[in-house]
Amino acid sequence: MNKKIRVRYAPSPTGLLHIGNARTALFNYLFARHHGGDFIIRIEDTDRERHVEDGERSQLENLRWLGMDWDESPETHENYRQSERLPLYQKYIDQLLTEGKAYYSYKTPEELEADHAKQEAAGIAPHYINEYAGMSDDEKAAYIAERKAQNIEPVVRISVDEKAIYKWNDIVKGDIEFEGKNIGGDWVIQKRDGYPTYNFAVVVDDHDMQISHVIRGDDHIANTPKQLVVYDALGWEAPQFGHMTLIINSETGKKLSKRDTNTLQFIEDYRKKGYMSDAIFNFIALLGWNPGGEKEIFSREELIELFDEHRLSKSPAAFDQKKLDWLDNEYIKNADFAKVFELTKPFLVAANRFDERAEELVKLYQPQMKSADEIVELTDLFYGDFPELTDEAREMLAAETTPLALSTFRAKLAELPENDFTVENIFPLFKATQKETGVKGKMLWMPIRIAASGSMHGPELPETIALLGKEKVLAHLDAALNK
């Protein structure tokens, strides 16, 4: 690539960072870093009605948490928010008006709605009908004067050549073309409040910031021909476009929707649950891109080195919550204990469980956790009531050899002094019980695990027994023997 690579992530501060937007940011970041280019953050805040307080801060904070950095942003550069760039937009709107490539439109929202209703009733796709069509200059002047007298504020529309073909070679999808007649007619580039519309402002911004590539979701494909209209009108070279496929829910096969409250979709949600940022970064990087091979766990450095925009998938990317949980568990299992302990601390504190056993409990459950917040539920045994047994667990306790195995193991535990109730001293008791009773394998370990912890699965049993403490374990074993 001869041209300096400059890409941007340009969120609207209208809410939290969605997983889909995070993917857009991440792919642009990987693309820029792989090619030694610039990654730019720009805030598109022209939609004042949907503006959310702290929306910008939330976007940047969560991108930073994911491990991304950037070369230019509103934090370091002036006029990187669209609301600060209004004079620049006005300059080019005035240029288009002067050149006759744009014009003031006085049709009211009610009139436009009525036009669209008639078109729909006739089976025609809604499109703008030029209000000046067929008017003489005098008629046009009289019409404008009448509208001004009624205090109707105009919008500015750009003229669309309906005979033109707008085409581009998409990085992901290959050659795409749109007929001008399908754009929907002359469209608004400046609203009544003086703010530019998205499709106009984004072109001015991308040109002004020398953006070389625009990589975004394929819900923007319909915006691209509109933006090409502006590039042509202003005589500018368009960047190269790439449109990533949709993200779908792996269980339903439907587009991932913010209205789907059963699926966590915001980066903030994963932060609050104690997921590791490295795992989320890794997971998102594989949503619609794959370097090939069977490997699924990559460091940020590996992803930057391997990233190839030509391997972006043409098929929808499946968001699989189970896969994400598996990945986070892998990261937690292999992370430094100090990092995992720090991650679990807020949850232990909130549950009033940050006591002298906290470190040992986190060590015990580190291999099991799919997210740090699970430490509370996992440690319920140590702080709450004995769990309700499953039918399968009850069947195991009802086995013919269970009473002998439990009573023998219980007697040996009881002989251990309180100060010697450690993993090193507990572990040999299993072998001693096996030798004395002849009960071995699953028929020995499983009833003891169920009786001591209430579960058929869990962390290392000797460690669990040691942390529960002698008094509690003996009480649990007695309860099982007396049933």
Curated annotation (Swiss-Prot):
Pfam families from the UniProt entry: Anticodon_2 (PF19269), tRNA-synt_1c (PF00749)
Enzyme class name: ligase
GO function terms (MF aspect): ATP binding; glutamate-tRNA ligase activity; mannan binding; tRNA binding; zinc ion binding
InterPro entries in the record: aa-tRNA-synth_I_cd-bd (IPR045462), aa-tRNA-synth_I_codon-bd_sub2 (IPR020751), aa-tRNA-synth_I_CS (IPR001412), aa_tRNA-synth_I_cd-bd_sf (IPR008925), Glu-tRNA-ligase_bac/mito (IPR004527), Glu/Gln-tRNA-synth (IPR000924), Glu/Gln-tRNA-synth_Ib_cat-dom (IPR020058), GluQ/Sye (IPR049940)
Annotated coiled-coil segments of the chain: none
UniProt-annotated binding residues for ATP: 258
Keyword tRNA-binding: no
Covalent S-S links between cysteines: none
Function: Catalyzes the attachment of glutamate to tRNA(Glu) in a two-step reaction: glutamate is first activated by ATP to form Glu-AMP and then transferred to the acceptor end of tRNA(Glu).
Species assigned in the record: Lactococcus lactis subsp. lactis (strain IL1403)
Enzyme Commission number(s) of this protein: 6.1.1.17
Keyword annotations: Aminoacyl-tRNA synthetase, ATP-binding, Cytoplasm, Ligase, Nucleotide-binding, Protein biosynthesis
A GO BP entry: glutamyl-tRNA aminoacylation
Protein name according to UniProt: Glutamate--tRNA ligase
Similarity comment: Belongs to the class-I aminoacyl-tRNA synthetase family. Glutamate--tRNA ligase type 1 subfamily.
Catalytic reaction list: tRNA(Glu) + L-glutamate + ATP = L-glutamyl-tRNA(Glu) + AMP + diphosphate
Residue positions of motif 'KMSKS' region: 255-259
Residue numbers covered by motif 'HIGH' region: 11-21
